[in-house]
């Protein structure tokens, strides 16, 4: 639940270097140029995240950034957005907390062009949610699957393109499902449009899917032998584009990650081997080449048939037959007839490629199903959805795949517009909120151009119609499609045609699509002959990948790839609309993929088409937060007695009551017909802080009661265990032998300045103010803290130079790891003195709670070392001193402490040169034990007060200074990864391994080496969408919500600040000299209650004078 009472000890943005503005709503000038300049300034200083209200802008740094470790996870967990610099962890934490508190599904839509960093952003969100959510072994298993699904799906679904070295060639919507307690206990992946054509063809300079290169680089010698793995240029499919290696990708290491991921997900070793067999089989399939014999295709070299047949478990002759011929069914009248058709070379190559594409797609679907089955749960409760989908892209030659990819991105842009620009403004009108509309470009016109069914029909409808009417025709279908497009939508302002294709004016710019293969790829039909061939495999696993029932009659029009992606896109939109959305807008700063390289025109183009300027204007003029009355009352009911546990009256009046209870200014909110609208994020933060403080207070009451109950039960046993350490060895004090053990005698909850020295999640076992004696036996007070890991001695010093000169600050004097303590020495008398012995030097300390301290220290020492801590008892103790830096003659030396029988219960100390003499009267016998009777509470921190005022007196005007802030530097060690399962060495096939034939030519030999133009990498022409953006009417300078009426003069008493005061707790006011403060309540304690700049809190009355 956040940082509770120690907000000022969080690492806050004002403690680090500022670069531009964190939230672009605060920009003084709202233009594309000022947005680009702010992003550039931050990017060059390695700040890749920036806010627009709650929207996160992320610029791809093209390098590993240092702020994604355990320290940052701790920093952002439970913290409000304004407390820390912009970060993807803040957005992830907001999603997770809102899901738990509001009981609503959340989703994050990550958008941006190819190479902008969407996939990496999705990984960070999933890893953060996995890290901060709790759970036992079963939950941990689900977390492991969530995290390991990434490398597995990337291996089979990602590839290097000219724009991105790790480009997602499929779309993915990952739902992490949670129990009501916020533990991830299930998940589900929906995948969209795998670009399977990449297996058999791609642009120059690109690669196929990573798994092919991983297998060749990472397979063991035994695997290479059995799978026929050799050099990359041996395989036609890989040599097509002439690109094998990628600078920042280690295929050998990634192959081991892929195998480990399959193990974690629960894919059996036999299935893993079969998956790799199919991957190798695809590569060998590509090496089958054809020649023309009498106008028909024949296999050029039949020895290349043997290895793919062997790996896929099929007959070599059947493979040859199905690649060069096909059974076609024809109907004449009422009769059906099957005709055997021999294929030409082009058709045979197409058939071979169709089989290779189908094999890869079916394996990919198998992996997705395996992941889903491993995370399956019988019912859904709450979930967080992460949308990681291929980015908008433009290549030298753009085909059907790019058309589908850019259509999905067009739909995502529409969602953003609908929810952040259009719906927000319409909501103000519906709710009766005063508002001046802000114009923007709505890309719905482009979506309709692509997906509309009628009046006029969209491109996809026309494409499906052509495919249906020309289903038996291979040639000429693409030109027919182009002609129909020109006839039906040729006049559309966002559409143009050219001799080989058409142009769409997308929101992100003009894209030229080549018609070649459009209809064939849209049909996406796998011939029955190939399904029969794979069903004839001797391997049940491969058979299971092709479950089609070939005997069933095919009725109706077959589903096309275009209609499938359109349905998937619309289903995705429906799913996202049911969730509370969050947005990450990814920006690609350059095409070189190098850090610190900034292309101004490219970034400006993205800023324009992403609509960031309009987003800032709507956010700035509008309301940061809106909620239906009932939900608002439910969330903040705990703030007042009248609303808790339920408000009995009119919901609108209940909301107004809550807002007035926190003294929110009336110009900071409006009440609509069914919702409350809050303007400034700071006002919302005030509500959240008050709510958190209430829950924190009640939680402390419950904790205190429970701890008291547990303590009463255990303290007798604890005292007895502690006394056993000293039994028959040391005399005991009469007043302390039966006392309770408190542990915290300082009140650490009220002293965050001491907590800064301890790890944030480190438990404090013992805290007390002790006396520490130096080499001259001069006593000085120290705070002694004991945790399971370390012992701390903290002192105070006055700062001698710098901006904090004159301030007294806490200083860590000594930190000893528990296992480094050698022994502890004590006398046999009833005194409170003990010596901690350590390798370097000893510490002479005095504490009235030594018995309790020693019992806890011995327990922690045993946990760390599995040994008993040596305790030495003698009336002459040796003390080893610290070496002083006084040159070559420096020496630590030693001192002696001698104990004598004296009078009274207070020890009398007499230092004499190098000896300290301690005399004290006799105590209880050494064999004394605590009794089991009830005892009165010993001195210690009570843990609370009976009023809301600070326990300290009101501070004197300037002269007393509060302690400074120190940033917490504790970092958890990284978790070691487990051992990975060894590679599989044997194949699952009964066939004998055939010899590997020599490849006669590579794919690059078969392709014409024409030089490729790189013009497509330039910033695209903005087209009609850009023109529409430029011509949208601008609102008047004071557009948006009308200026509120001036507030009436206050009728409450006021005072003027004589001096500046910095709040030292969350319920206090900070103010500057000459500030005017409204006085709410005067109190004799010296702490008055007042209100300044919309915040109510306590302040010292001797810093002000009444007006």
Swiss-Prot record:
Q: List, as start-end ranges, the regions of compositional bias called Polar residues.
A: 933-949, 977-989, 998-1012
Grouped into one coarse class, the protein's main location is: cytoplasm
Q: Which residues form the Myosin motor domain?
A: 19-692
Q: What does this protein do?
A: Myosins are actin-based motor molecules with ATPase activity. Unconventional myosins serve in intracellular movements. Their highly divergent tails bind to membranous compartments, which are then moved relative to actin filaments. Binds to membranes containing anionic phospholipids via its tail domain. Involved in clathrin-mediated endocytosis and intracellular movement of clathrin-coated vesicles. Required for normal morphology of the glomerular basement membrane, normal development of foot processes by kidney podocytes and normal kidney function.
What does the subunit section of this Swiss-Prot or TrEMBL entry state?
Interacts with CALM and F-actin. Interacts (via SH3 domain) with SYNJ1, DNM1 and DNM2. Interacts with ARL14EP. Interacts with CARMIL1.
Q: What PANTHER family does this protein's entry cite? A: MYOSIN, UNCONVENTIONAL MYOSIN-IE
Q: What is this protein called in UniProt?
A: Unconventional myosin-Ie
Gene name per UniProt: Myo1e
């Amino acid at each position: 639940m956040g940082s509770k009472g120690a907000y000022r000890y969080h690492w806050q943005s004002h403690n680090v270097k500022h670069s531009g503005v964190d939230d672009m709503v605060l920009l003084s000038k709202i233009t594309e140029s000022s947005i680009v300049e702010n992003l550039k300034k931050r990017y060059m200083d390695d700040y890749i995240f920036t806010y627009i209200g709650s929207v996160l802008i992320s610029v791809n740094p093209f390098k590993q950034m240092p702020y994604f470790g355990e320290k940052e996870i701790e920093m952002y967990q439970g913290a409000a957005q304004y407390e820390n610099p912009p970060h993807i962890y803040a957005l992830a934490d907001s999603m997770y907390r809102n899901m738990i508190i509001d009981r609503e599904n959340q989703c994050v839509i990550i958008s941006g062009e190819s190479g902008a960093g969407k996939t990496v952003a999705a990984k960070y969100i999933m890893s953060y949610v996995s890290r901060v959510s709790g759970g036992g072994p079963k939950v941990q298993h689900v977390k492991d699957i969530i995290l390991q699904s990434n490398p597995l799906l990337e291996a089979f679904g990602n590839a290097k393109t000219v724009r991105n070295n790790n480009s997602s060639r499929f779309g993915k919507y990952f739902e992490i499902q949670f129990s009501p307690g916020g533990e991830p206990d299930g998940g589900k992946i929906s995948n969209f449009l795998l670009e399977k054509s990449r297996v058999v063809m791609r642009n120059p300079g690109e690669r196929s899917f990573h798994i092919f290169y991983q297998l060749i680089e990472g397979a063991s010698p035994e695997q290479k032998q059995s799978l026929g793995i050799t050099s990359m240029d041996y395989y036609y499919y890989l040599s097509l584009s002439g690109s094998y290696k990628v600078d920042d990708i280690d295929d050998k290491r990634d192959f081991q990650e892929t195998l480990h991921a399959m193990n974690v997900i629960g894919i059996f070793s036999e299935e893993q081997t079969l998956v790799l067999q199919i991957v190798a089989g695809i590569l060998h399939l590509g090496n089958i080449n054809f020649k023309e014999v009498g106008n028909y295709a024949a296999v050029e070299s039949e020895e290349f048939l043997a290895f793919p047949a062997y790996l896929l478990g099929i007959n070599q002759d059947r493979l040859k037959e199905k690649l060069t011929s096909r059974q076609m069914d024809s109907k004449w009248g009422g009769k059906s007839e099957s005709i055997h058709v021999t294929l030409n070379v082009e058709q045979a190559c197409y058939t071979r490629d169709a089989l290779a594409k189908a094999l890869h797609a079916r394996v990919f679907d198998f992996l997705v199903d395996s992941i889903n089955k491993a995370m399956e749960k019988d019912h859904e409760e709450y979930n967080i959805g992460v949308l990681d989908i291929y980015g908008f892209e433009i290549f030298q030659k753009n085909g059907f795949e790019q058309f589908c990819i850019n259509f999905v991105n067009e739909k995502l842009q529409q969602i953003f517009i609908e929810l952040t620009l259009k719906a927000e403004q319409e909501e103000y009108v519906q709710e009766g909120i005063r508002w001046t509309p802000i114009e923007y470009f709505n890309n719905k016109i482009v979506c309709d151009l692509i997906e509309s069914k009628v009046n006029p029909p969209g491109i996809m409808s026309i494409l499906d119609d052509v495919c249906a009417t020309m289903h038996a025709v291979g040639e000429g279908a693409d030109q027919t499609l182009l002609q129909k497009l020109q006839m039906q939508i040729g006049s559309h302002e966002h559409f143009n045609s050219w001799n080989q294709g058409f142009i769409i004016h997308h929101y992100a710019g003009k894209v030229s699509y080549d018609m070649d293969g459009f209809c064939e790829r849209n049909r996406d039909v796998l011939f029955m002959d190939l399904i029969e061939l794979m069903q004839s495999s001797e391997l049940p696993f491969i058979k299971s990948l092709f479950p089609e029932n070939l005997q069933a009659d095919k009725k109706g029009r077959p589903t096309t790839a275009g209609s499938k992606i359109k349905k998937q896109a619309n289903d995705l939109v429906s799913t996202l609309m049911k969730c509370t959305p969050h947005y990450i807008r990814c920006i690609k700063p350059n095409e070189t993929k190098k850090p610190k390289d900034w292309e101004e025109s490219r970034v400006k183009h993205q800023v324009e088409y992403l609509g960031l300027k309009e987003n800032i204007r709507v956010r700035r003029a509008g309301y940061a937060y809106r909620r239906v009355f009932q939900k608002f009352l439910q969330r903040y009911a705990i703030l007042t007695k009248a609303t808790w546990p339920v408000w009995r009256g009119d919901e609108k009046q209940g909301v107004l009551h809550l807002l007035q209870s926190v003294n929110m200014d009336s110009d900071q909110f409006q009440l609509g017909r069914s919702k409350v609208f809050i303007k400034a994020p700071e006002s919302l933060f005030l509500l959240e802080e008050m709510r958190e403080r209430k829950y924190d207070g009640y939680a402390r009451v419950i904790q205190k009661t429970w701890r008291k109950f547990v303590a009463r039960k255990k303290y007798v046993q604890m005292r007895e265990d502690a006394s056993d350490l000293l039994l028959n060895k040391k005399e005991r004090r009469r007043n302390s032998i039966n006392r309770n053990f408190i542990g915290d005698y300082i009140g650490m909850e009220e002293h965050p300045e001491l907590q800064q020295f301890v790890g944030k999640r480190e438990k404090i076992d013992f805290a007390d103010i002790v006396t520490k004696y130096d080499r001259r036996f001069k006593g000085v007070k120290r705070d002694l803290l004991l945790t399971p890991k370390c012992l701390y001695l903290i002192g105070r010093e006055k700062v001698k130079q710098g901006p904090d000169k004159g301030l007294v600050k806490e200083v860590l004097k000594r930190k000893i790891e528990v296992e480094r303590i050698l022994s502890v020495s004590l006398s046999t008398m009833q005194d409170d003195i003990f010596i901690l012995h350590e390798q370097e030097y000893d510490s002479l300390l005095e504490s009235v709670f030594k018995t309790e301290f020693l019992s806890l220290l011995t327990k922690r020492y045993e946990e760390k070392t599995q040994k008993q801590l040596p305790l030495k008892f003698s009336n002459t103790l040796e003390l080893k001193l610290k070496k002083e830096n006084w040159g070559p003659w420096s020496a630590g030396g030693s001192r002696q402490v001698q104990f004598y029988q004296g009078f009274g219960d207070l020890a009398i100390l007499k230092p004499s040169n190098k000896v300290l003499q301690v005399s004290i009267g006799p105590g209880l016998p050494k064999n004394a034990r605590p009794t089991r009777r009830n005892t009165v509470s010993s001195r210690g921190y009570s843990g609370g007060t009976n009023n809301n005022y600070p326990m300290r007196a009101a501070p004197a005007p300037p002269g007393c200074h509060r302690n400074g802030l120190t940033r917490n530097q504790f970092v958890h060690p990284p978790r070691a990864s487990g051992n990975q399962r060894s590679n599989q060495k044997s194949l699952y096939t009964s066939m004998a391994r055939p010899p590997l034939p020599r490849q006669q030519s590579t794919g690059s030999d078969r392709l014409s080496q024409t030089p490729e133009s790189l013009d497509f990498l330039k910033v695209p022409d903005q087209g009609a969408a850009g023109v529409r953006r430029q011509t949208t009417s601008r609102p008047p300078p004071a557009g948006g919500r009308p200026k509120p009426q001036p507030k009436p003069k206050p009728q409450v008493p006021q005072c003027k600040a004589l001096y500046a005061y910095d709040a030292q707790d969350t319920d206090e006011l900070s103010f500057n000299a000459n500030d005017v403060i409204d006085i709410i309540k005067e109190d004799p304690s010296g702490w008055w209650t007042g209100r300044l700049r919309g915040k109510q809190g306590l302040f010292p009355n001797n810093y002000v004078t009444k007006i």
